[in-house]
Amino acid sequence: MNTALAQQIANEGGVEAWMIAQQHKSLLRFLTCGSVDDGKSTLIGRLLHDTRQIYEDQLSSLHNDSKRHGTQGEKLDLALLVDGLQAEREQGITIDVAYRYFSTEKRKFIIADTPGHEQYTRNMATGASTCELAILLIDARKGVLDQTRRHSFISTLLGIKHLVVAINKMDLVDYSEKTFTRIREDYLTFAGQLPGNLDIRFVPLSALEGDNVASQSESMAWYSGPTLLEVLETVEIQRVVDAQPMRFPVQYVNRPNLDFRGYAGTLASGRVEVGQRVKVLPSGVESNVARIVTFDGDREEAFAGEAITLVLTDEIDISRGDLLLAADEALPAVQSASVDVVWMAEQPLSPGQSYDIKIAGKKTRARVDGIRYQVDINNLTQREVENLPLNGIGLVDLTFDEPLVLDRYQQNPVTGGLIFIDRLSNVTVGAGMVHEPVSQATAAPSEFSAFELELNALVRRHFPHWGARDLLGDK
């Protein structure tokens, strides 16, 4: 057993008391991102090492792996604690998203270590989708790079409001305050173009040497701010979903016997209580909440993020993908929306194409009506394009095969986030964040069917010499 863990258990008075104490700690999900070789995996390894989260057998294995795959000479290569794939260790880079868990006396943490290479941007977006804070690493020798801008933009696009800019490898620039100040000013100039009201903090550190990671650096007396760990332990995360109206997407209908019929899922936002009048969408049928069932018994109320089963007073038709909300709330179903898209497939996204989509447990089909623009990550400008390439980010107009109940992603990530699925391979090819649902009154009707639009796109792609016009060219 880890000696630090054994000491914590002893201090709490036993395993059971320690587990209860763990349950009451707040949880922070964060990711590390930045350009290639900025030291993301090394930083996570340093956090695990300095908070004494490494078991003795892991430490022994790390010594052996450092000799075989290490990139730090005689020193421990802490990045190997996180880079688990054989290809990652051989190349000295991160490819997949690696998740690690650790805790301190103040908080629990789940870390997502995301890849820095541009071709793995889709992996980074996957890691960011569940996080509340992003650590953006910048190599003190290189300053702000294109990939730093890309990751900053994706993080904010996915709703992350707390950014910690960790200026790493300060030991390689002689712990220069001038270098730190210059990079800080450069990043703030860029960050002024990012959307939203952001909480941005700066920490100069050396992940390799441990400066300002978990303890104050003696080499940077000019820096009087908190260490990285202190920032992580004290940052206050305001969850947007807590203040939003009730949203309960039904994941499945639970009917173990003839006497029980419940609707299971995770409360996406708001709160629900016994006796509350609720409405089922898209049908619009209303009922009252009779019971709120959880794994440890019935409750009188439940809050966002909790897995529950709702039992209603009436026997009504509800299936997977339906949405329950307060009966007095007017939320119309829509068949069109503008969506911010991060494209993850080799074949570009083009107007006229159709994909299966999944959103809040519901699966349906969507047609790409047009691409308004692609974002140039270097300067955050918008430019017109015919299609959206691999790792491209842009605003896309979609039309759905059936009415859907949507929220803007920034208001509710569960009912505003969707994925694109290729209909032939069943592979996830893109991630979407609802920018704005389009009401039926403002949606422009299409004079062409979905089949005609898809056939037109195929002809233009494979037989360009025919000179077929783009049926959506006026959009």
UniProtKB/Swiss-Prot annotation:
Key words of the record: ATP-binding, GTP-binding, Nucleotide-binding, Nucleotidyltransferase, Transferase
Region (G2): 92-96
GO BP terms in the entry: hydrogen sulfide biosynthetic process; sulfate assimilation
Annotated region described as G3, given as residue ranges: 113-116
GO MF terms held by the record: ATP binding; GTP binding; GTPase activity; sulfate adenylyltransferase (ATP) activity
EC number, as in UniProt: 2.7.7.4
Family the entry assigns: Belongs to the TRAFAC class translation factor GTPase superfamily. Classic translation factor GTPase family. CysN/NodQ subfamily.
Protein name, entry field: Sulfate adenylyltransferase subunit 1
Lineage, opening ranks: Bacteria, Pseudomonadati, Pseudomonadota, Gammaproteobacteria, Enterobacterales
